[in-house]
From Swiss-Prot:
Residues that, per the record, bind NADP(+): G165, K166, S167, I190, I231
GO cellular component, one term: cytosol
InterPro entries: Aminoacid_DH-like_N_sf (IPR046346), NAD(P)-bd_dom_sf (IPR036291), THF_DH/CycHdrlase (IPR000672), THF_DH/CycHdrlase_cat_dom (IPR020630), THF_DH/CycHdrlase_CS (IPR020867), THF_DH/CycHdrlase_NAD-bd_dom (IPR020631)
Family: Belongs to the tetrahydrofolate dehydrogenase/cyclohydrolase family.
Pathway: One-carbon metabolism; tetrahydrofolate interconversion
Catalytic activity: (6R)-5,10-methylene-5,6,7,8-tetrahydrofolate + NADP(+) = (6R)-5,10-methenyltetrahydrofolate + NADPH; (6R)-5,10-methenyltetrahydrofolate + H2O = (6R)-10-formyltetrahydrofolate + H(+)
Protein known as: Bifunctional protein FolD 1
Gene3D superfamilies (UniProt xref): Leucine Dehydrogenase, chain A, domain 1, NAD(P)-binding Rossmann-like Domain
Length: 295
């Protein structure tokens, strides 16, 4: 039977490490990390997610600065706020909650964030640093995937990894992180020809395709590790609806280990946001940035 990789427990351990790191930073005479969270509009899912982020931020000893703007806020006004936050020495991390209203170009907003404060890891500078293997701020979900894998894999060198999904948020960066660990990586997507045959070659499968139950039991070889990033709600809202991943969990008992949905990758994203905020604060204050990328 596949071992269940408990993302909730691992995320809790990371949050505890971050809290200890904040205490150590202030004991060294540094300022506690500060995270600015910017929310434009009243999207219900975004409101819930931002509330969760802020609560966990405060529990870790990180100061939070919340900026809620009306849905009609202009792009220029939002860019002006980002510029002020870039100059604010009390703010070490800036997070703009996505999605933004349609009249605001998300790429312009994300590109305006100081790369040193880009705790989501989406700025082109941080993407470039990741691609060449130098220290930057790593996107939170891919970083969380790697930390989960590290709990069940001691040596990544030479392992065959198949990533299903090519997004800039998960697929591409997690592929680069796996390459950094000397895996042999194949990036695929839902239109890839002979996808099941490709997945069957993998020691590690990371699926982030947004397709419920895409990876079937006969796609995965015995002993492989499956990281399921998918979060899909199926069924009628308020009745029999439930969250499922992109892998057919009940068919994958022959895997060595697998993340559940919910309770796998999801909790790691916010935990890694806190981790990135601590790293950003230490770097901006001239302290050792430990923990480093991929550690």
């Amino acid at each position: 039977m596949a071992a269940i990789i408990d993302g909730k427990a691992i995320a809790a351990a990371i949050r505890a490490e971050v809290a200890a790191g904040v205490t150590a930073l202030t004991a060294e005479g540094g300022a506690a990390p500060g995270l600015a969270v910017v929310l434009v509009g009243e999207d219900p899912a975004s409101l819930v997610y931002v509330g969760r982020k802020i609560a966990q931020t405060r529990q870790a000893g990180i100061r939070s600065f919340e900026h809620r703007l009306p849905a009609g806020t202009g792009e220029a006004d939002l860019l002006g706020l980002i510029e002020r936050l870039n100059r604010d020495d009390e703010v070490h991390g800036i997070l703009v909650q996505l999605p933004l209203p349609r009249h605001i170009r998300a790429d312009r907003v994300l590109d305006a964030i100081d790369p040193l404060k880009d705790v989501d890891g989406f700025h082109p500078v941080n993407v470039g640093r990741l691609s060449i293997g130098t220290d930057g701020l790593v996107p939170c979900t891919p970083l969380g995937c790697m930390l989960l894998l590290e709990t069940v894999i001691d040596d990544f060198r030479g392992l065959k990894a198949v990533v299903i999904g090519k997004s800039n948020i998960v697929g591409k960066p997690v592929a680069m992180l796996l390459l950094e660990r000397e895996c042999t990586v194949t990036v695929t997507h839902i239109l890839t020809r002979n996808l099941p045959d490709i997945v069957r070659t993998a020691d590690i499968v990371v699926v982030a395709a947004g397709s419920p139950g895409l990876v079937r039991g006969d796609w995965v070889r015995p002993g492989a590790v499956v990281i399921d990033v998918g979060i899909n709600r199926i069924g009628e809202p308020g009745k029999d609806s439930r969250l499922v991943g992109d892998a057919a969990f009940d068919e994958l008992g022959h895997a060595a280990a697998i993340t559940p949905v919910p309770g796998g990758v999801g909790p790691m994203t916010v935990a890694c946001l806190l981790r990135n905020t601590l790293v950003a604060a230490r770097r901006q204050q001239g302290a050792d940035a430990s923990p480093k990328k991929g550690a």
